[in-house]
Amino acid sequence: MSTKYKTTLAVLAGVALGAVAMQGLHAQAKPKAYTVSELETLDAAANAAFVPVIQAAQKAAGGRPLRTGGGKIVAMEGAAPKRVAITEWDSLEQAQAFYKSKAWNDLTPQREKAVKTIRRYVVEAVN
């Protein structure tokens, strides 16, 4: 085999491998998602017991609790909610699956004693 032929084959192989690698990287690049729960505490003691339980359930499902209600909420436009909980997920589908899961449904009695949900939604982080 001539050197020119070997070089051409090597370049073509490199291009093919690079294309396959880029395809794989592109397929994995799903945007993260965030659930935002606007809440009102109904019972402080029940809420204190509920927070670690819900965080453990979210973590078991792949979620990462970012904010669980403490700290200031400053209204920029409109009224600020009394309490906000934010959880990061690897994808919109992962967040939706958790909120349709048995683990979430099993927490309903405890959750309903602790907090009143004003609004809950999922935001997909797309650049």
Segments predicted by a language model, with ranges:
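C-terminal end-helix/capping segment
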Residues: 112-127
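Bacterial N-terminal signal peptides that target proteins for export
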Residues: 1-12
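Short S/T/G/P-rich N-terminal loop/turn motif that feeds into the first structured element of a domain
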Residues: 13-100, 123-127
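Short, exposed beta-strand-loop hairpins at the edges of beta-sheets
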Residues: 96-99, 109-115
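Short, hydrophobic secondary-structure boundary micro-motifs
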Residues: 66, 107-108
